[in-house]
């Protein structure tokens, strides 16, 4: 994300592929990084590394094709009116991001375990850059294009578009058990850390930030770290 500098800030973002706040929080983190690295008062500007860790908000979600997203939310969150309010609030949050997120709540929701396997595969194949491309592709698939996050065909298309695997190789991977144990271990690790909601961002392996904080909040923490004013 930047050339090597005197200060490296490591971010581990625990998230789920069907968590809208994870998408918003990720966009806010990227915006905070861009603004900080453009700040002439910080010289040299800090270097950031990002890695995603797995979490499932709802392990009971059925496999693809899953079930209607809105109907599931209505049962889980307390009815149609409450869900409509939640959806509208999230649409507004998305449009405030830079670049904007165009949340669309049609389509189905299904189990996210295979999406997490693909995210981990991206890290194995190409490190941070590949993983970020896959995460961004998955967020866009589910939240902006009403795609099925559990569909092997949809996931394989994300993998191919990100350049980590050809589509047929991605389908072969998804049909296997490769990285299943590693992802399940990641779920357990989040639980052992006491993470009960996402996004949850761990900075420099020591400092935890819960939720999709505002861009300015992330930026202030990063700025203090870069200036040596915050010791973790």
Spell out what each predicted region is.
Residues 1-5:
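Plant-biased recognition of short, low-complexity, intrinsically disordered N-terminal tails
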Residues 8-14, 18, 25-41, 52, ...:
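C-terminal cap of thioredoxin/glutaredoxin-like
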Residues 20, 78-81, 174:
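Short, surface-exposed alpha-helical recognition segments that flank or form part
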Residues 27-145:
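Structural alpha/beta surface segment adjacent to cysteine/selenocysteine redox centers
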